[in-house]
Amino acid sequence: MKNLVEELKWRGLYHDSMPGTEEQLLKEVTSAYIGFDPTADSLHIGSMVQIILLVHLKNFGHQPIALVGGATGMIGDPSGKSDERNLLNEETLAKNVAGIKSVLSRFLDFNSKEQNAPIMVNNYDWMKEFSFIDFAREVGKRITVNYMMAKDSVKKRINGEGEGMSFTEFTYQLIQGYDFYHLYKNNNCLLQMGGSDQWGNITTGTELVRRMGGENAKAFALTTPLITKADGSKFGKSEGGNVWLDADKTSVYKFYQFWVNATDADAEKYIKIFTFLDKETIDALIAEHQTAPHLRILQKKLAEEITIFVHSKEELEKAIQASNILFGNSTADDLKKLDEKTFLEVFDGVPQAEIAKADLENGLDIVTVLNEKTGFFKSNGEARRALTANSISVNREKIKEDFVLTANDLINNQFVLLQSGKKNYFVIRVV
């Protein structure tokens, strides 16, 4: 079999693994799982590393298992958290589980008939009938409190300045550990993967498999590094918060812009992690980018590849069209194709003013619009000089002083875009 660990290492997707993991993956088709807890009804780009890891696993001939944590989500993972998580109610959890299943289904074909077809499971299905007494006897008996207390996620909470850790969160690693044993027993799953912050929980699982599975039981672990930006700040957030994988939470335009705006150092790192381009292609792109960094070749290729992967080629083309509007490489037709949400996002931060729709019934002369109605220009004289200089556009089309603004000029029946020169924009919202 091809060497998956070697592939992960050059891409920057490998952090650590248990002894024997690489040999197991080279020896035979191996089932491996990653857990996704339903803390929200979608996933953001912070989860992309784990999704991509499952896709690489599949591409290298192994079987990926995506576990949605309907049970573990009821408790909350304490790893990397300084405070107790708020418990989610069942209705919210059910909605979140459905949302995450929907997202994962875009990247892995769970209906495939292949031998190594991806599987999706929900740990609530096997935990819901487990009584506390049975769990304490069958699982709790196998792992000592000393072992659990030695985990970093536990030590940091207990030795920190907060309120410590509840018994509920303390048991999280046992439930996650039992997930591994359940998948080992029922799906012949030998490997659990996750972010490096999950090492403690994952190794509890490998320990449980060995102690519950008998003397021939084997279990392996592999983790990915936590992704940070070159400046050390947290990856996955923009100024507006999380960058989501659902277009109704983060538009395709904003998703595309997030990657296009990456620094050179970040783009060089991200293109290895977040795309499936081969090493030769990536090395050539990096070399080409370094000859003309101002063209942002690397960032554009990164944004294109991951936008197609997460959304589609069609959505990528729309995002590129929307991006071109701000930089002058667009037409009036391109502007009219924008939906309301994308229009407002493209021109976020641009000065705006409202005009009553009734004012447009008989038409408004452009000088009145530019000065009195919007304040885009300070005086009629200044507006006329700009018009005479042929520097005013309405919806990307140059106009003269005799232009009259009417309802026929509205974009989405609501907006008008004014432009003076190359970079001065003004949006009229008609109400």
UniProtKB/Swiss-Prot annotation:
Signal peptide residues on this chain, from the entry's feature table:
none
Explain the purpose of this protein: Catalyzes the attachment of tyrosine to tRNA(Tyr) in a two-step reaction: tyrosine is first activated by ATP to form Tyr-AMP and then transferred to the acceptor end of tRNA(Tyr).
Q: Which GO terms describe its biological process?
A: tyrosyl-tRNA aminoacylation
**What GO molecular-function term can you cite, just one?**
ATP binding
* Keywords for the protein's UniProt record, in alphabetical order: Aminoacyl-tRNA synthetase, ATP-binding, Cytoplasm, Ligase, Nucleotide-binding, Protein biosynthesis, RNA-binding
Q: Where is this motif: 'KMSKS' region?
A: 234-238
Position of sequence motif 'HIGH' region:
38-47
Do you know which Gene3D superfamilies this protein is assigned to? HUPs (3.40.50.620), RNA-binding S4 domain (3.10.290.10), Tyrosyl-Transfer RNA Synthetase (1.10.240.10)
Q: What is the name listed in the Swiss-Prot or TrEMBL entry for this protein?
A: Tyrosine--tRNA ligase
Q: Does the record's keyword annotation contain Electron transport?
A: no
Q: Which residues cross the membrane?
A: none
Mention any one GO cellular component term assigned to this protein in its UniProt record.
Answer: cytosol
Does Isomerase count among this protein's keywords?
Answer: no
Q: Share what the entry says about its subunit structure, partners included.
A: Homodimer.
Organism equals Flavobacterium johnsoniae (strain ATCC 17061 / DSM 2064 / JCM 8514 / BCRC 14874 / CCUG 350202 / NBRC 14942 / NCIMB 11054 / UW101) (Cytophaga johnsonae)
Q: Which positions bind ATP?
A: 237
Give one Pfam family: tRNA-synt_1b
List, for all copies, the residue spans of the domain called S4 RNA-binding.
364-431
Q: Which domain of life is it from?
A: Bacteria
> What gene, per UniProt, encodes this protein?
tyrS
Reactions that this protein is recorded to catalyse: tRNA(Tyr) + L-tyrosine + ATP = L-tyrosyl-tRNA(Tyr) + AMP + diphosphate + H(+)
Annotated positions binding L-tyrosine: 33, 172, 176
Assigned EC number: 6.1.1.1
What NCBIfam families would the database entry show?
Answer: tyrS (TIGR00234)
